[in-house]
Amino acid sequence: MNSLAIETQEPRAQAITINEDSLSVDLMDGRTIIAPLIWYPRLWYGTAEERNNFEIIGDGALIHWHDLDEDLSVGGILAGRRSGESQKSLKKWLEERRTRNL
């Protein structure tokens, strides 16, 4: 009996583009993922400058936004997972932002 093992690799980001409506992730294997920015409220509420201040870490497996305290896994984006942040947590974060920006 033969068994065929399919080798899979964790998706890895090569480049990120963010506009007012979407997050686009170019993968190392040539694919591009595009997700609505509204799925990630901290990115949605962040300024263009904050959204564009990101770092691809973990050999391309994660994207980190220091200014927004946000981390997304490339695998999660590919799987269509939205932010799991609670409304209570998001509300607190937004209030803290308003206080800092006064």
What are the residue ranges of the model-derived segments?
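Motif-centric detector for short Cys/His coordination patterns
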Residues: 1-102
